[in-house]
């Protein structure tokens, strides 16, 4: 199921990890829009990934909840948002707890 996020302006979520977050640790968040055809690799997909580190704002932290609230415009490669279909996390912390994932205005 895809989400129409065209009216939304920001992405928000909270994360917590017990793992070390000092450099070179990174936590990446990718949003993917499947395009009007709603199909992965359908030729009209767009995506963008942001990277968090101990030096970014917000900063990764060990054993503390971190609120990530960023404008969707920070996902510069995400040129359309009418068919959001994937939210992908990757990075160095092996254990990450995620809560309160939402899009808002």
Q: Positions of the model-derived regions?
A:
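Extracellular ligand-binding interfaces
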Residues: 1-78, 92-105
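Noncatalytic modules at the cell exterior or secretory-pathway interfaces
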Residues: 76-86
């Amino acid at each position: 199921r895809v989400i129409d996020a065209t009216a939304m302006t920001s992405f928000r979520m909270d994360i917590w990890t017990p793992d070390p977050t000092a450099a070179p640790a990174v936590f990446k968040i990718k949003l993917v829009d499947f395009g009007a055809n709603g199909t992965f690799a359908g030729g009209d997909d767009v995506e963008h990934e942001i990277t968090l580190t101990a030096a970014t704002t917000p900063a990764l932290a060990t054993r503390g909840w971190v609120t990530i609230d960023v404008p969707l415009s920070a996902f510069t490669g995400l040129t359309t948002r009418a068919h959001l279909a994937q939210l992908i996390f990757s990075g160095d912390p092996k254990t990450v707890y995620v809560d309160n994932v939402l899009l808002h205005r």
